[in-house]
Amino acid sequence: MKLHYVAVLTLAILMFLTWLPESLSCNKALCASDVSKCLIQELCQCRPGEGNCSCCKECMLCLGALWDECCDCVGMCNPRNYSDTPPTSKSTVEELHEPIPSLFRALTEGDTQLNWNIVSFPVAEELSHHENLVSFLETVNQPHHQNVSVPSNNVHAPYSSDKEHMCTVVYFDDCMSIHQCKISCESMGASKYRWFHNACCECIGPECIDYGSKTVKCMNCMF
């Protein structure tokens, strides 16, 4: 009976998220999994807008770092108009502390039949772009998000203007969670990763000075 109840509730949650209008809804790609978990555990059932905030603290703890992005999915805060700031215009970035440059280069040389897209462009082009995405740096020692500012003397890839360096990045074809994105990029030896809030994952190679490309290019995860 309990399994049946959980299945019905999960289906109802997914239908609810699908029904929400695109321009006025929560970030489905980012929030669906965690929202479902919190609702199944009945931690977000109260309605602050109606004066009942008895579950607010438990719901916030359940959503954790996703509270700011996902509180509107569970009716805890006012809905936002995402037509002005689509998920593709935001991303989370992180440096990977044990990159394997030789592995990354080997996996990205030549044509591959794997489910990813390899893109290379001059480092000078990478550095010339202004950071027009809202990016956050997540590290083990810095649990709170902070705006990214990357020094030009990044230890992963020293840059010299007298030689043309190429920045190589890999986009996975399919959408994935931020956790899976980090694991996938670590497994191919990347130096950093960028996870767009539409769930597109970009692994960044050792020659890149900044955080790769700010453009979504995941074949099956563009919106």
Swiss-Prot record:
Gene Ontology molecular functions: heparin binding; transforming growth factor beta binding
Positions annotated as glycosylated: N52, N81
Signal peptide positions on this chain: 1-25
Family matches, as InterPro entries: Tsg
Function field: May be involved in dorsoventral axis formation. Seems to antagonize BMP signaling by forming ternary complexes with CHRD and BMPs, thereby preventing BMPs from binding to their receptors. In addition to the anti-BMP function, also has pro-BMP activity, partly mediated by cleavage and degradation of CHRD, which releases BMPs from ternary complexes. May be an important modulator of BMP-regulated cartilage development and chondrocyte differentiation. May play a role in thymocyte development.
Protein family per UniProt: Belongs to the twisted gastrulation protein family.
Comment text on domains: The N-terminal domain is sufficient to interact with BMP4.
Record-given protein name: Twisted gastrulation protein homolog 1
